[in-house]
Structures are given as C-alpha cells and as structure tokens.
Amino acid sequence: MKIAIDGMGGDNAPSAVVEGVVSALKEYSEMTFYITGPEDKISLELSKYDYPKDKIIIIDAKEVISTNEHPVMALRRKKDSSIVKALNLVKDAHCDGIISAGSTGAFLAGCTLIVGRIKGVERPALGPIMPGRRGNFMIVDAGANVDSKPEYLVQFSKMGSIYYKNVFNVDIPSVGLLNIGAEEEKGNDLTKATYKLLKEENSINFVGNIEPRYIPTGDTNIIVSDGFAGNTALKMYEGSAKNILGMIKDEVLKADLKSKIGVLLLKPFLKRIMKKFDYKEYGGAPFLGVNGICIKAHGSSDGKAFKNAIRQTKIFYENNVLDEIKKEFEKKN
C-alpha cells in the first residue's frame, strides 16, 4: 500500500508527520510513504531516524496552504503546495490514500475537486468515529456540508453504514437521525423530509430520530445529520468529555487525603476512560464519497496521532471500503 502524506499539514509539521510515518513503518513494513513538502525540511527531520530509505520518498513542494486562506482559491493558486501535490498522487493512482492535518477547508475542497467524487455521490461527507459507552459510533456529516438536502443525508447514511459494516464487522449497522426529539414529526423541514426518505430506504437499518443526549451511549452506530448540526454535536461532545474529566481533577485537588487515596485506586480506570476520548487514538476522520481514501487528521496531531491515522487508512484499504461504496452507488446509475 502507498500513502501520500501532507508533510506540512498541521500545527506540529513536519516533525510530528515524520515521527508518525517512521513509527508506522516499523509496524507496517510493507507500506511505502510519499511525504510532500520542502525537501530540505523533510530531509532534515528524516535524518534523525534510521529507516529503510526506499520506503519513504520525498516529493518536493515549496508552498503551504494555511488555515486562514480561502480553500478553493488557495488550491488553484498554490499548485506547488504540499496538500495539492499529495492529492495529485491519489488522483493519478500513484498512491492509494492521503492523510493531512492541514487546513480542513482546503483538504475537503481538494479531495472533491482534485481526487473527485464517486459517480452518483451528490456530496462527500466527513465521518469521524467517536467513543460511546457501549461502543464506537460515527457522526456523518461532521462539517463538510453546512447546507444539505434530505437526499444528501440518505447518501451519508449509506456511506456511513458501508464503512461501519466493513471496518467494525457489524452486519447491519443502525442509523439514527440527529434531531431535537424522538417523535417522527419533530424537527425542521430538513429532518422531517429526511426521516420519510430514511424510513423508505430498505438498504439502511434506520432506527428513527436520536436526541443528542443519547448519542454518548453508543447504542446507535451511525448518527446522520447535516454538517452544521453534526459538527456542533461533535465539538460539544468532545468539549463535554474534556470538561468532565477536568472537573474530576479539580475536585481531587480539593479533596482530603482519604479521598485522594481512593482516587489513586481508581487511577487505572480513569486513565482508560481518558484514553477513549483522546483524539490521538483515532487518528483522523474518513472523508466518504470521494474517489480515494482520504483521511483528515486533527490539526494538532502529534507523532502518535499520525501513526494511528496511518493505521486507520490501512484498515480502510484492507476492508475494501472504497470499492464497496462504489458498488452501492453504481446500482443507482
């Protein structure tokens, strides 16, 4: 498997990118990585490690697209940027997938415009995997499409179901529609119309509306929504988890000695919970519906996060998720 890596994407690039790639190569020796970015900077970082030289290839790219640039304009203007060169490697079928922790807007726009959509897919969607009490769940769309149509959400449900089925070995993943109430008549025009379409779609295991308070249980495998609501729910969930853990720490500091000793006994359990909510463990979010394996890593990813993003890309590839999505949409054309 060959993976294109945006060597200058993210707050900690290129050091964290190179660290993650070298670390992953120790575990996945069959892989080959193409890191895009200024050759001198990437070479300097690589010189710190011992690795098989034929397994990491540098693709020189002089420019970088920052997060404050207009995504589409930057993609058109900066043809020699690390992200554009990485995307072209996938477009030209030189690489099987791409990972970037750079500008989300530029990455998503680039995946759509350069790599291209799968035939039949109206809008690609971002689908991060999150930890739930009784299992992982996917939120799709989590921010790629702020404005959506009911038909788009049905497609998001299909792509999310295919991903979840093949990656987590769940034969019939459940799909819930993010809404303000469980009843069918609740919500706005978008959710009401989407509910009707999902209920009629035989290829989806639609279980009805799901309120945000029930998302963390993990009982529903795929939470489908427009990008605005999905991104809001995702960030609220991430923020709540961090704040609850922070509140526990604050209370421990104020507690008496006896209580602190009790907390020490719980430390292994608390560590496991904290690990579940650490974005580094998940690597990144798949961008579903484009004609390639595209993984968006967190902007502040470190070496560990990049390594796990590589692992996630490998799982996507080995489980033929891309081909399965293509097959589903070929039926409709």
Swiss-Prot record:
General function of this protein? Catalyzes the reversible formation of acyl-phosphate (acyl-PO(4)) from acyl-[acyl-carrier-protein] (acyl-ACP). This enzyme utilizes acyl-ACP as fatty acyl donor, but not acyl-CoA.
Q: Per the record, what is one GO cellular component?
A: cytoplasm
Pathway(s) served: Lipid metabolism; phospholipid metabolism
What's its catalytic activity? Answer: a fatty acyl-[ACP] + phosphate = an acyl phosphate + holo-[ACP]
Main subcellular localization, coarse class? cytoplasm
Reading the lineage from the top rank, the first entry is: Bacteria
Which BP terms does GO give this entry?
A: fatty acid biosynthetic process; phospholipid biosynthetic process
Tell me yes or no: is Flavoprotein among this UniProt entry's keywords.
no
The organism encoding this protein is Clostridium botulinum (strain Alaska E43 / Type E3)
What's this protein's name? Phosphate acyltransferase
EC assignment = 2.3.1.274
Q: Where in the cell is it found?
A: Cytoplasm
Indicate yes or no for the key word Phosphoprotein.
no
Assembly mode = Homodimer. Probably interacts with PlsY.
What does the similarity note say?
Belongs to the PlsX family.
List UniProt keywords, sorted A-Z: Cytoplasm, Lipid biosynthesis, Lipid metabolism, Phospholipid biosynthesis, Phospholipid metabolism, Transferase
Q: Name one Pfam family in it.
A: FA_synthesis
Q: What are the protein's GO molecular function terms?
A: phosphate:acyl-[acyl carrier protein] acyltransferase activity
